[in-house]
Amino acid sequence: MREFKDSEGRPWRLALTCASAARIRDMVAVPGEDGKPKPFDLVDGKTLGESVAMLRVSPILVGEVLYAALAPEVEAKGLDREAFLSGMSGDSLEAGLSALEAEVVSFTPGRLRGVVSSLLTKMDELQSTETAEVVRQIQAMTPGAGITSTSSPASSGSTPASGPSANSPAP
């Protein structure tokens, strides 16, 4: 069980169990390859890497997954989905995602736990490398470089008007 606080300071106790994993699958949908919604299965070993990758780039998905996992606790606190999600932003999303990832490792049966832990560690390393590269590229930018103008340049006096010029042969 992992604890984190939302942006309102409310504490949440997250435990990934078969019941909470089933709630996530039943309550959260993501776009499938065909564009149609498909259940988000956080603990399916075949798609775990893809699921974690989706969570790491979608704060709203993190909030929805946490809501589904914590639904009984949310209800016990007299909150609805909107109130819960209103408390999920910034650092609380980061804390919730960290708790969720740690719970995925704990949830996984022992014989596969090392594999899941290694997967998450490798994803952390890759994300750090990619982030450092993006920061390096941003710092290497020069003012005005790569900025596309949306306006046309001012008309030049040497640009001829439409139609034949004085040097054009007569028809």
Segments and roles (model prediction):
Residues 16, 57-58:
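A generic short alpha-helical patch detector that favors 3-5-residue windows
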Residues 1-20:
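Short, extreme N-terminal segment that most often corresponds to the first beta-strand
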Residues 22-28:
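Covalent nucleotidyltransferase core used to form phosphodiester bonds in nucleic acids
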Residues 13, 54-55:
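Generic alpha-helical structural element
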Residues 1-7, 26, 33-54, 60, ...:
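Charged interaction scaffolds used for protein-protein
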